[in-house]
Amino acid sequence: MNTAALREQIQRAHQHEAETGQLLQQLKIQLPHLHPAIHLPEVDAQGALTRFVTAYIDLVPDLLDAAHEVAIEAGIEGQIRPVLRIAEHFFTAPPDIMQGHEGLDSLLDEAYLAHRLVEEVNDLYIKHFGQPLIPSNTTVASVIAHQVIGEQFANQLDEAVHHAVDQLLDDEDFALDSVEAYREKLSSPDTEAAWKRWPSLSRQLGIGLELERSAG
C-alpha cells in the first residue's frame, strides 16, 4: 500500500484549506441543512463539524494500512489488496463524478469512498468469520459524512463502492485453506492483542461518535 502518497496528498489539502478556508465556508452553508438526527454541540458546532471531517479524512491511510496488515495475517491479501488499492485509487485518481472538487472538500468525498469500501469488506469478514477485518466501526462516522456530502451525491459514491466490491470479492474467496487457518486463529488470545495495535482508529473517530452520543 502506498499510503505515504495519500498522507502527502492529505497534507497538501490541509495547506489548501489553510490558504482558502474553502471547506470551512462550505460547512458553514451546510450546517443549517444537516439532517436533524445529527446533533452537534451548541457551542462551536461549525468547529466540531470541521474537526470531524478532518479526522475522518486523516484516518484513511491508517485504516488502509491496518486492513492490509490484517489481510496478510488472514492469508487473504491476494483477495483484499485489490479492494484496498481501489480505495487508494479513489484518492490518486478520483472518479469523473468528482470533477471540480478540490482540497479537503474533494478528500471528504474520497475518504467516504475509502471508509465505505473498508466497511463493505468488514461486513464480508463478519459474515464469514463472525468479526470484522479490523475492529473499527466507522458506520456512524460515515452516516454523518453521507449527510455532509449530500444525499444524492453520496448515494452515487455508494454505488461506486458496491460495484467495486461485487467485482472483486465473492464467497469463494473466503473458502481458501489459508482462510480456514485464519478462522481457527481468531480464537487465539494473540488475536485480541493484535487488534490493540490500532487504538488510534477509535480515538480519531471519537468526534464522529461524540456527535451521535450528544443526541438527547
Report residues per predicted region.
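Terminal, membrane-proximal amphipathic helices
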Residues: M1-P82, E119, I126-G216
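Membrane-inserting effector segments that mediate pore formation, membrane fusion
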Residues: P82, I86-R116
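Hydrophobic alpha-helical segments
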Residues: L113, D123-L124
